[in-house]
A protein has these predicted regions:
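Conserved Class I S-adenosyl-L-methionine
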Residues: 2-11, 19, 31, 57-59, ...
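A short acidic, Gly/Pro-enriched loop at the edge of an enzyme's catalytic core
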Residues: 107-118
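A short SAM/SAH-binding and catalytic strip from SAM-dependent methyltransferases
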Residues: 117-131, 154
Length: 278
């Protein structure tokens, strides 16, 4: 229960409503700011062809497309139909590169060999059952000299708001659920291990750096509890009755209390960003 596999399967099977909650809460507060850092790291310029692996609701794709201009292109891949539906339903970006969405797993990308100048992946690698296979696919898709940029969360302890939320999950749903929750997005936290994976996948000039940004949730602990619908514990949270949900909200209030100021959760988020060359 609640393993990294459960995170992946819940993403793949989640309803569109769960993905909308993810998009509304986490994307503007975390994924957009970190996508800026990720894209800056690979030196994007107009006219390039970009691959976005595990594109989710189109966060990185929509950020990079205006930088590429109409002469560039973005191909965005994800396993989750719900994520792709949310992404494809967003309005077109004026003066930006066109974005094409494709449903496929990261270790079997539906793209041609050597077609892309840049391959990006924000917070997907840690979920892939075959991480080396996914990196090999990204390398296959890149032109010689093409650049890969991959973001992977640091340890959950370096993301205090998620650490506290995991504690609340354990109090209400049990230790096994907490362990599974903690194993997901934060399941590949070591910079050395990240570098080794890229080197084994035959990338060169591998550079791993830690980046931290403020994380503010204006809606308080309840706003973070709402993100659990897209997590490994999503089905368990959905099955709670009114009393159970009230208990979960109370647990989140207690666990997150040290981070709450004027009703807002104010913390920090930290990720590793890897840049490497094919």
């Amino acid at each position: 229960m609640g393993s990294n596999t459960d995170w992946s399967s819940n993403f793949a099977a989640a309803a569109v409503s769960a993905m909308i909650a993810y998009d509304d809460i986490l994307v503007p507060r975390l994924f957009n700011p970190f996508a800026d850092v990720l894209v800056d790291g690979v030196a994007v310029s107009p006219g390039l062809k970009v691959l976005d692996v595990a594109c989710g609701p189109g966060t990185v794709s929509r950020l990079v497309a205006p930088r590429l201009g109409p002469e560039g292109s973005v191909t965005a891949c994800d396993l989750s139909p719900a994520m792709l539906e949310v992404a494809a339903g967003k309005p077109a970006l004026e003066g930006a590169a066109p974005i094409t969405y494709r449903q496929c797993p990261a270790d079997e990308l539906d793209v041609p060999d050597g077609a892309f100048d840049i391959a990006l992946c924000q917070q997907g690698l840690q979920f892939f059952p075959d991480r080396l296979g996914a990196l090999a696919e990204m390398r296959r898709a890149l032109k010689p000299g093409g650049r890969a940029g991959v973001a992977v969360w640091c340890a959950i302890e370096e993301n205090p708001f998620w650490d506290a939320l995991a504690t609340a999950v354990g109090w209400i749903l049990g230790k096994e659920a907490e362990i599974g929750y903690r194993s997901g997005p934060w399941g590949l936290p070591e910079a050395d291990e990240l570098a080794r994976l890229f080197e084994v996948a035959e990338f060169s000039d591998v550079d791993v750096r830690r980046h931290a940004l403020p994380a503010v949730f204006e809606g308080g602990p309840a706003q973070l509890v709402a993100t659990l619908s897209a997590a490994s514990v999503g089905p368990q949270v959905a099955a709670l009755d009114a009393a159970g949900r009230a208990a979960l909200l109370a647990a989140a209030d207690a666990a997150l209390a040290p981070l709450v100021h004027d009703g807002e959760v104010r913390s920090e988020a930290a990720t590793h960003i890897v840049v490497a060359v094919r």
